[in-house]
Amino acid sequence: TDKLIFGKGTRVTVEP
């Protein structure tokens, strides 16, 4: 599970 932080400050959890 990788947490990506975008410039919008939104945390998204992505599971490949």
UniProtKB/Swiss-Prot annotation:
* The keyword DNA repair is assigned to this record: no
GO (cellular component) term, any one: T cell receptor complex
Nucleus among the record's keywords? no
Species name: Homo sapiens (Human)
Record localization? Cell membrane
Gene coding for it: TRDJ1
Instruction: Kindly list the biological process annotations in GO that this record carries.
Output: adaptive immune response
Query: Main site of residence?
Result: membrane
Protein purpose: J region of the variable domain of T cell receptor (TR) delta chain that participates in the antigen recognition. Gamma-delta TRs recognize a variety of self and foreign non-peptide antigens frequently expressed at the epithelial boundaries between the host and external environment, including endogenous lipids presented by MH-like protein CD1D and phosphoantigens presented by butyrophilin-like molecule BTN3A1. Upon antigen recognition induces rapid, innate-like immune responses involved in pathogen clearance and tissue repair.
Per UniProt, subunit arrangement is: Gamma-delta TR is a heterodimer composed of a gamma and delta chain; disulfide-linked. The gamma-delta TR is associated with the transmembrane signaling CD3 coreceptor proteins following the stoichiometry: a single gamma-delta TR heterodimer associates with one CD3D-CD3E heterodimer, one CD3G-CD3E heterodimer and one CD247 homodimer forming a stable octameric structure. Upon activation, gamma-delta TR complex associates with FCER1G to initiate intracellular signaling.
Any idea what this protein is called? T cell receptor delta joining 1
List UniProt keywords, sorted A-Z. Answer: Adaptive immunity, Cell membrane, Immunity, Membrane, Receptor, T cell receptor
